[in-house]
Amino acid sequence: MALLKISVVVPEGEVYTGEVKSVVLPGVEGEFGVLYGHSNMITLLQAGVIEIETENQKEHIAINWGYAEVTNERVDILADGAVFIKKESDDRDDAISRAKKLLEDASSDRLAVSSVLAKIESL
């Protein structure tokens, strides 16, 4: 299976880069998945969680909003704010707290934010 290249960048610098099997993005019209060979597109992203599937694990990045450029072999994400939540990390609890704060500050829509926060808490 061919791998997809992905990069997640915020104004302060790069949050994540790598080769992945798939990625699920929080689009403004709903979540959508991207695999190698996807059609080209540029889309707006809403507050949510980017789900990244690598060869051997799933990783998560919370974003407040941003843009994604998708080509058949890569995904480039420019976000206003992002927190990489590493599954097995000493600062995981701190990352989850920062992700919750980022998402709470991103939207006044409490219902939408609460569903994303529930997703983060289940990681």
Swiss-Prot record:
Keywords, in A-Z order: ATP synthesis, Cell inner membrane, Cell membrane, CF(1), Hydrogen ion transport, Ion transport, Membrane, Transport
Membrane topology: Peripheral membrane protein
Compartmental location: Cell inner membrane
GO MF annotation list: ATP binding; proton-transporting ATP synthase activity, rotational mechanism
GO BP, sorted A to Z: proton motive force-driven ATP synthesis
One GO cellular component term noted in the UniProt record for this chain: proton-transporting ATP synthase complex
Family, per entry: Belongs to the ATPase epsilon chain family.
Subunit-level organization: F-type ATPases have 2 components, CF(1) - the catalytic core - and CF(0) - the membrane proton channel. CF(1) has five subunits: alpha(3), beta(3), gamma(1), delta(1), epsilon(1). CF(0) has three main subunits: a, b and c.
HAMAP family: ATP_synth_epsil_bac
Function: Produces ATP from ADP in the presence of a proton gradient across the membrane.
Entry-linked NCBIfam families: ATP_synt_epsi
PANTHER family (alphabetical): ATP SYNTHASE DELTA/EPSILON CHAIN (PTHR13822), ATP SYNTHASE EPSILON CHAIN, CHLOROPLASTIC (PTHR13822:SF10)
Protein name: ATP synthase epsilon chain
Species this protein is from: Helicobacter pylori (strain ATCC 700392 / 26695)
